[in-house]
């Protein structure tokens, strides 16, 4: 007869997912009775996985016996001999306690809370775990340390052999405690007493899952140390329980595997299924071994293997609680959503980018040099901040921010560095590189049974709660009594923030690993020494002790008497007030720091003791102001240089175009002269067009009279006359060079005068304030802002004989007589510095100008008019001249002259933008300017109105026009009566309000110019343009009139006089006005 054995039931029911945020907020780990704990541990590659809302479902095989569920989220390795009770085992123990009577343990610490609730859904009946036992037995739960949870792959582990179970029969609390260490002891630890139960009767009944049987048990739970590497195959969905009878009883481990997964890749399915089949074979072998063991101990009841053909029911896996901690920002988040939003936030990204930049700069410099401005600074490794002095560092250590970080790291079990400051220098940076790397590699070393654990490469700052809770250093004396049985030791990437503490970080590695780490540290420090010595150009680094002493002893506090205490009604000091700096503070330490500060010392030197030595420390703002000033000066010099080059290029292009035109005219004249000398004389069907600039192309036959090429329209007679007149009135090369020379000299001399006046004004206003230069606002604009070319000089309309040009000097304030006098005084001295030639300078208050005249030949004159944009802004703002005149200084210059100078500036800009690029426009304007100077009738025509009229007439044409046609079109416009009073007039495009440019002309002057234009148009129609231009007639280029019609003319005109000459004699009295 087979005896009925008691059945030990382990029931895991998935807990609700909604309480994660609450538990993670206060570092609260809620392990509910009868529910599976939720874990998320960082894998070997430094990657943490979090469970989604819909977790994978587990399907457990059914067995025909009693209903007991074993569904854990950890698969310990069977090869580990160490007997311990990690956090997952504690959870299983809590579940077992709930099944056996609702055991509620008493806690030594308040960090963990347990709550018991009944499972909402009855669990499905899984296979039974049955054992044979004696009357008196010891019940010890034995499992390998489950230290990792991989949510992507689930593998079955081989069943524990009887030898392992027998070895696990004896409790070993000392070894377990030495293996799992915790510095702050955030978990709880009770006496590890074996569970003993004496049965009075041999009849036992099957325990139902919903009906707990009375039992008492004592458990010993040790927090898991994060120093152990996560196992690669630690994702199996089963727990390997091991029970030992005292002294002759041991059972096989039972494994259950789920075969239904959701939300994972197909590769994981195939890997899990193949591994599952292998484990089923191992289960069969384990069952045979169990039968043999039972026979050896006198028992005849063996464990039945689970059936593979039963229907599988899905069961959701447990989801462990997570602690969301960001290593970069050193903060914890309430939940996954908050943590995700933090990672996507700007603050985190900025800190991460700054960290990467600092790491790259330190790595590029060989790890031995720091950035500029960080030398001799005290650094807090925990908060990753640098302080400029010992007082600032002490205030930071006492501050709320540092204390908050310390509290958070204490909760998470992270190592807290020593509060002793580390001086940021070349030697300290290189010395901390090796310990960081070694300690981090030791922390992340652990057993590994598969290479799949390194398949993830994404970075994450999420740390597991179980891992973070036990990452501190241990206090046990037997810390190194456990050796780690590992197939390979892997090193993961070091975290982005390395904690370098004052004490050595203790890990669970063996002594050999520690010796290797020390050797690596020595080798790396030795390797960094020649790298530092290789940089000969770098100064020798100051030792941390000397730098710290220098920071502490350099500055002595001054001005204690000027800091008064402010007390409340009870006489208690509530704050301090500095009368020198007009500031308040409520911390005595801040008072000492303020008395040593540079701001207070500067105020003390300014108001109390001028002899106090204060180091000159150029601030970032002062340096930026200086750089901005230099940049503006370079830009201004570049602007003037480019402007001179553009002006030179414009003049050269204009001369080049005129030379090309005249070359073509000469070639055409030679061509027609050659044709006129030919014996046949002329062409029967009209002359063809003249050849190009290079003559007839080689190989091209000369056109025959019977089939000539369609002729190109030659330049008309009017074009020849206009271009000949333009060449006559164009300035010579000597005149152009003389004008360019005197203008350039004047501009450079005015620049020097502007510098002198600016320095004088700045020196007068800065007396007694030299110590506050770096705190001042940027200096105001200089009084003389710049000089601009205006009039015919800027427009390129100079004529032969023009000796006067105009410049405009812009001022930042309204120009006054005093300013004009100062410029006249300084300008002659600066002219001698620019050029050795003699120039005469005189000021004209009536014209609001300075007149500069050259003493050598040719005599040139430059008129420099002073003006300011403020004058036009005020007039446009209020429109009342009298009101603005009241505010002006007493010696302000003539307002209208200044406004005319501003208008000349706008006219020059408009002309360069609109008229300069228009074909034949500049030539026609020069012809009309010459006409206004020769003919008194046209002298009343304003030059600005004439420029507007020519530009409008030429730009409104359908296409480009030759000079003769353009001149004819302008005369046609004037002849149409556009200048008369009833006409629309010419509106000034450079004024805000509609302004007629012809408003200054009288009615008689308008009619005279209109009549003269009509008469000139008649002369152009009768081929007498030379009379309008005031030049002699050019020789006839086309001889066909003389050759073909000579005889006919002689017969009709017996006196021998030419028809054009006779007509010219009759009309001589009509064009005498031109």
Curated annotation (Swiss-Prot):
Residues 767-781, 1062-1074 have a biased composition (Basic and acidic residues). GO terms for molecular function: DNA binding; double-stranded RNA binding; single-stranded RNA binding; zinc ion binding. InterPro entries: DZF_dom, DZF_dom_C, DZF_dom_N, Matrin/U1-like-C_Znf_C2H2, NT_sf, Znf_C2H2_sf, Znf_C2H2_type. Residues 697-1073 form the DZF domain. Its main location: nucleus. Signal peptide: none annotated. Residues 344-374, 412-456, 508-545, 697-718, 761-781, 1036-1074 are annotated as: Disordered. It is found in: Nucleus; Cytoplasm. GO terms for cellular component: cytoplasm; nucleus. Residues 700-711 have a biased composition (Pro residues). Keywords: Cytoplasm, Developmental protein, DNA-binding, Nucleus, Repeat, RNA-binding. Residues 417-456, 520-533 have a biased composition (Low complexity). SMART domains: DZF, ZnF_C2H2, ZnF_U1. The keyword Endoplasmic reticulum does not apply. It holds the Pfam family DZF_C. Involved in postimplantation and gastrulation stages of development. Binds to DNA and RNA. This is Zinc finger RNA-binding protein. It comes from Danio rerio.
